[in-house]
């Protein structure tokens, strides 16, 4: 097992990619704390992890609230003895709006959740990873952060910001044994993707080199790799799990 003896915190772990990430980490031996504002889903994910005979509990965590994040991380350290891996998966993606129709309150909310939330969680775990001399922070961005997205001013901006933050953390963390990387999913067959009208799903899938969406497990496998010692000399990278959507396809 790649992650035996490690303790991981996954934010946004109640459903979607965050849930699959948590399960994948547990399958490789990690104990996993599932953090979310939706406790029902977080508890369910945690129960699935416990069924794998791994230590796990769900924790209510609003990543926009610094004190709440700090308290949650302190609880993890107290109850599980360590915090080795952080997967920042909490995010909002629930609206499309061109620049003149973009609501200010949604712009501010997306900045708080997606970008400041990633900052808050990374900062909270940092002292423990620094003290131990080992840590892995994997941040979830998106190809929208590198390519832009029509009608996605707030979302693509926050994801681009996460990439910049990750590179800075990588520079600062390497001397302490803290590796920081960012995963950029493309078109993934997730719950939110399946809500899109079928004709739009088909059009988006055809933009990829594979002409089909990826699966949540494809993203989770990348995260497991980056969390492991197999990636010990990798930091500051932007890993696209995108099926080549950023390539010119025709």
Question: What annotation goes with each model-predicted range?
Answer:
Residues 97-99, 103-111, 193, 204:
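Substrate-binding pocket helix/loop in short-chain dehydrogenase/reductase
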Residues 122, 158, 166:
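Active-site helix of classical SDR
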Residues 142:
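Residue(s) in the substrate-gating loop at a strand-loop-helix junction
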């Amino acid at each position: 097992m790649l992650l035996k003896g490690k303790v991981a915190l996954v934010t946004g772990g109640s459903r979607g990619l965050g849930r699959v990430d948590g399960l994948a980490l547990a399958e490789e031996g990690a104990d996993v704390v599932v953090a979310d504002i939706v406790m029902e889903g977080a508890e369910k994910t945690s129960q699935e992890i416990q069924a794998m005979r791994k230590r796990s509990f769900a924790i209510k965590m609003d990543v926009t609230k610094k004190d709440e994040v700090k308290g949650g991380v302190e609880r993890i350290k107290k109850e599980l003895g360590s915090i080795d891996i952080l997967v920042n998966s909490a995010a909002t993606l629930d609206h499309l709006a061109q620049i003149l129709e973009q609501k200010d309150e949604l712009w501010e909310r997306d900045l708080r959740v997606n970008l400041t939330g990633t900052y808050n969680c990374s900062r909270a775990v940092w002292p423990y990873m620094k003290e131990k001399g080992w840590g892995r922070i994997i941040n979830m961005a998106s190809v929208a952060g590198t390519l832009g997205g029509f009608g996605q001013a707030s979302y693509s901006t926050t994801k681009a910001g996460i990439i910049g933050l990750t590179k800075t953390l990588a520079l600062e963390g390497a001397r302490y044994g803290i590796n920081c990387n960012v995963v950029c999913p493309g078109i993934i067959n997730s719950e939110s993707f399946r809500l899109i009208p079928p004709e739009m799903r088909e059009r988006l899938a055809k933009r990829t080199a594979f002409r089909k969406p990826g699966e949540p497990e494809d993203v989770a496998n990348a995260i497991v790799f980056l969390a492991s010692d197999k990636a010990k000399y990798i930091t500051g990278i932007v890993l696209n799990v995108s099926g080549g959507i950023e390539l010119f396809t025709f």
